[in-house]
Amino acid sequence: MTDSLFPRLVLAKGREKSLLRRHPWIFSGGVARMEGKARSGETIDIVDHQGKWLARGAYSPSSQIRARVWTFDRNEAIDSAFFERRLQQAQTWRAWLAERDGLDSYRLIAGESDGLPGVTIDRFGNFFVLQLLSAGAEYQRAAIISALQNLFPDCAIYDRSDVAVRKKEGLELAQGPVVGELPPALLPITEHGMKLLVDIQGGHKTGYYLDQRDSRLATRRYVADKRVLNCFSYTGGFAVSALMGGCRQVTSVDTSQEALDVARQNVEINGLDLSKAEFVRDDVFKLLRKYRDQGEKFDVIVMDPPKFVENKSQLMGACRGYKDINMLAIQLLNPGGVLLTFSCSGLMTTDLFQKIIADAAIDAGRDVQFIEQFRQAADHPVIATYPEGLYLKGFACRVM
């Protein structure tokens, strides 16, 4: 019936259009049937309703994303050499970026945008932090680790696949050392002249938000001799950058005392004036209302909240959350002040986020000018056929 060496996923009639445009996902609603038995994560061929070969990918029976494409080349085998090629292609770009910007830390693999769906690898010095977020990525774990070791023979690898999305793939959470020594409790890295401490084992995501690197640098352009409020500060990257930019004072707000303690250390290890830095453990929504009621004012506010939306059913509620928190920030800014506001929610489009900021300004009774736009750093590329890869967006807004 077929010359395929792999089980075949047959698409429903008319559902091949996205694959012909080289989008890497096949949703469960587009599947007509499976031909042959495939285990979770196993390599399969994907064909149209007439049996025409379209792609080769990984099967995920537990997920709404029923398959993720590894390759659109029928002659390409999915083996250790495949993963080594993908890693080498990605490293070529990151090595150039690292030399250009003086980086020792970057995202080596950004999932679908680097041709490895469900795979995230962040590099912090000689430590590589691995996240395998799909059934296919987990199935190929040994091949991925082998490829990484071949490319970086002396590296240490730590697994941070402790992400809830794995449960949607029918996978258990995983965390721990894979290769080499255990990372220190706080690993020092460098970024645009800053020294920063990263908690690989217990920090958010892989330990640090590398995607905001360029936005942190851009902050310095707005803060000279200004009073700055840094909301959802985590370990203080924006605060350190603001101090390096010559701010008069910066207040960092987060609910985690552990993160604030690291933020304080980050200020100290950079030799910056600790008297200009304040660290407040509080809920940002509540604190902004308190500041508003007390008549507090700031010249620059950084608003970098966590993801508010995980799926489409949460989008409307997330819009209200973004609008509320940005309205409060706008109310706290002096005339001519600048709001640096971000969304890392992939379902939140740039246009929708901009509209939310505009609506927040109307509710605050203020006019705003959009003066600069931000996105994730260049080591987090967005492949043209997978626009969902652009998840981080932000604006610098001048508040009148």
UniProtKB/Swiss-Prot annotation:
One cellular component term from this protein's GO annotations in UniProt: cytoplasm
Keyword S-adenosyl-L-methionine: yes
SUPFAM superfamilies: PUA domain-like, S-adenosyl-L-methionine-dependent methyltransferases
Catalytic activity: cytidine(1962) in 23S rRNA + S-adenosyl-L-methionine = 5-methylcytidine(1962) in 23S rRNA + S-adenosyl-L-homocysteine + H(+)
Major subcellular location class: cytoplasm
Similarity section: Belongs to the methyltransferase superfamily. RlmI family.
Name used for this protein in its record: Ribosomal RNA large subunit methyltransferase I
